[in-house]
From Swiss-Prot, chain A:
This is Protein YIPF6. The gene is YIPF6. It comes from the Eukaryota. The modification N-acetylalanine is found at residue 2. It is found in: Golgi apparatus membrane. GO terms for molecular function: identical protein binding. Residues 106-115, 168-184, 234-236 are lumenal. The keyword Membrane applies. The modification Phosphoserine is found at residue 7. The chain crosses the membrane at residues 85-105, 116-136, 147-167, 185-205, 213-233. Belongs to the YIP1 family. It comes from Homo sapiens.
């Protein structure tokens, strides 16, 4: 009932808005949005209530989120010009990938701190701190992409490298030698290129053309360092 | 000639007429909302007025740039756009600055010719990051190559080198410019004629001067000690020359003793950085890796290890 009373008032206040804005009078232009905001939250709440997730089973909720994550994985593995990865971002996929990568990079024996590969925390810090730095860099360069969208893309695009890590661990089960290393090198280079192609397909359009290289270079460095960590991994 | 003068005169008249017609309040409010528009308007205005008064083109250019710089520093310290002004560069500009740092010439001032009152933090930050990671990666690769030549060396990835390289490079690229900037500010108080660079410009000079070390570090992968030293000396010479040529116009006004001391300290610190990189990351056989094999393996490998000892001493 309250909405029914307020909604006729809404078009009445909306029509003089451009007229007052033209005058650029501060006192009036401040008045109008206040009146507008009274009605809008009520409506959105009502609309939200119809498609509420409160009544559905927990299984449905989890399955829907897992499906969203899986769909984004498919987008990374087959990068197209599509903004699904950008529109509804989440950080579940990056978290899963990062933890998987860090767990697989963990060496079996943590002997001495000085003589070994990256520890779990170091991988975690490199991935998240690197992604945040790249995102800040692209924002500072004037990119029109939101902070979490960029984090989401960078995190999801680790997927090929996580796959490379899995293959490397399997290859390392075989006897060591130059052939073994060559296979790992090939896999890591291919997956590295894949990560770069996928992430630039999503991120490059957010920058003006004369700054695209400046925004893409840090991404290249980021995936290069992760690839290097994967390639030099030896289980012992 | 006369027609050209008339043209410019008309242009000015038009501009003043336009200014007179448009109310002041409206233009200021608009420039507050849309920064690019205000930016353009100021640049045109200052260029015109200075062009009329000063005959020298460079003077007006400089004045316009100064004006531009003042315009840029309008946003407050806590706003995001304040930091965006430090990353306001294009790809071509960054490449031009890198080229300028790679090819120093006497009398060719890096700040005057390449930064042009618009220092950026993109270059210093990412050059430092690249250098740190390249140092760590190549430092590991030398070990791998050493293992290839001599299978008795046990290689394992040394991730701590990333941390060491990152901390040392970033500390050098930020603390030394800070000290230099502070020193020059102090000297300015003593000698009034000096016009020192701003802190950002000093950071920029140092950041871009480190770029030469990236190809040098990659070339250090060649396991020939004398070649490594030649590459090191070449890169150090280029980098230090760029620094000296850029700093010389500032310290020239100071007393001869202070100028010489300052420049030699700058070059010495740069040489220390290069030497430190060489000795820490490019030992062909670090002592940490020599210690474990005797404990694990038996006597024959221990004997096989001893011929490598002179090799490790040779480059260092």
């Amino acid at each position: 009932m309250a909405e029914a009373e307020e909604s006729p008032g809404d078009p009445g206040t909306a029509s003089p808005r451009p007229l007052f804005a033209g005058l650029s009078d501060i006192s009036i232009s401040q008045d109008i949005p206040v009146e507008g905001e009274i009605t809008i939250p009520m409506r959105s709440r009502i609309r939200e209530f119809d498609s509420s997730t409160l009544n559905e089973s927990v299984r449905n909720t989890i399955m829907r989120d897992l499906k969203a994550v899986g769909k984004k994985f498919m987008h990374v593995l087959y990068p197209r010009k599509s903004n699904t990865l950008l529109r509804d971002w989440d950080l579940w996929g990056p978290l899963i990938l990062c933890v998987t990568l860090a767990l697989m990079l963990q060496r079996d024996s943590a002997d001495s701190e000085k003589d070994g590969g990256p520890q779990f925390a170091e991988v975690f810090v490199i991935v998240w701190f690197g992604a945040v730095t790249i995102t800040l860099n692209s924002k500072l360069l004037g990119g029109n992409i939101s902070f979490f969208q960029s984090l989401c893309v960078l995190g999801y695009c680790i997927l090929p490298l996580t796959v490379a890590m899995l293959i490397c661990r399997l290859v390392l089960l075989a006897d060591p030698g130059p052939v073994n290393f060559m296979v790992r090198l090939f896999v890591v280079i291919v997956m590295f290129a894949w990560s770069i192609v996928a992430s630039t397909a999503f991120l490059a359009d957010s920058q003006p053309p004369n700054r695209r290289a400046l925004a893409v270079y840090p991404v290249f460095l980021f995936y290069f360092v992760i690839s290097w960590m994967i390639l030099t991994f030896t289980p012992q | 000639m006369a027609s050209a003068d008339e043209l410019t005169f008309h242009e000015f008249e038009e501009a003043t007429n336009l200014l007179a017609e448009t109310p002041d309040a409206a233009t200021t409010s608009r420039s507050d909302q849309l920064t690019p528009q205000g930016h353009v308007a100021v640049a045109v205005g200052s260029g015109g007025s200075y062009g009329a008064e000063d005959e020298v083109e460079e003077e007006s250019d400089k004045a316009a740039l100064l004006q531009e710089k003042q315009q840029q520093q309008q946003p407050g310290f806590w706003t995001f756009s304040y930091y965006q002004s430090f990353f306001d560069v294009d790809t071509s500009q960054v490449l031009d600055r890198i080229k300028g740092s790679l090819l120093p010439r006497p009398g060719h001032n890096f700040v005057r010719h390449h930064l042009r009152n618009r220092p950026d933090l993109y270059g210093p930050f990412w050059i430092c990051a690249t250098l740190a990671f390249v140092l760590a990666v190549t430092g590991n690769l030398t070990l791998v190559l050493a293992q290839r030549r001599d299978p008795s060396i046990h290689y394992s990835p040394q991730f701590h080198k990333v941390t060491v390289a990152g901390i040392s490079i970033y500390c050098y690229a930020w603390l030394v410019p800070l000290a230099l900037w502070g020193f020059l500010r102090w000297r300015k108080g003593v000698q009034e004629r000096m016009g020192p660079y701003t802190f950002l410009e000093t950071v920029c000079i140092y950041g871009y001067s480190l770029f030469v070390f990236i190809p040098m570090v990659v070339l250090w992968l060649i396991p020939v000690p004398w070649l490594q030293w030649i590459f090191g000396a070449l890169a150090l010479g280029l980098s230090a020359a760029g620094l000296v040529f850029t700093l010389w116009p500032v310290v020239r006004e100071d007393t001869r003793l202070v100028a010489t001391a300052l420049l030699s300290v700058v070059v010495l610190l740069h040489a220390l950085l290069a030497m430190g990189c060489k000795l820490y990351f490019f030992q062909s056989l670090p002592p940490e890796n020599m210690a474990p094999p005797p404990q694990i393996t038996s006597l024959p490998s221990n004997i096989a290890l001893s011929p490598t000892l002179p090799q490790s001493m040779a480059p260092s």
